[in-house]
Amino acid sequence: MRNAKILCEEIADVMAEIDPDHADVYKANVTAYNEKMTELDEKYKAAVSAGNQKTVLFGDRFPFRYLVDDYGLDYYAAFAGCSAESEASFKTITFLAGKVDELDLLAILQNESADGSIAETIKNNTKEKNQTILTLDSMQSKTLADVEQGASYLSVMEENLNVLKEALK
């Protein structure tokens, strides 16, 4: 969220340079948008503060580094960043399943484009096998149709907030 605010400000500044006749409009728009992002940022801080967990575990790729860093969360993931890998090793699965057990995690996270197989395999290798598999949206696969139906950075991050609250219980 914090990087998104910086990017929005940079875009507005460049647009104002390109189109100085509407610079005030760009400035007003970015100010209003950043206020909404600040409100959402506060909700994220509150959710993390209220959560019982301070660690999230991804049975998937991990494009959420800025998110966990911004809110002081620890994390484990099957793959670093947005790796091209799609098959987790036995060692990775057993390590992550062990972390779920060790930390008493109630949720395993995955990305919106995941088929769920890695998260399910991790779950099936835990002692309790009762974790909920939740999906965070990285926005990497949003389409024009999604945007036309109302998807925006803020709406997706609001949905992700609800998922994160569940994961941190």
Description of each model-found segment:
Residues M1-K169:
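Extracytoplasmic metal-acquisition and chelation regions
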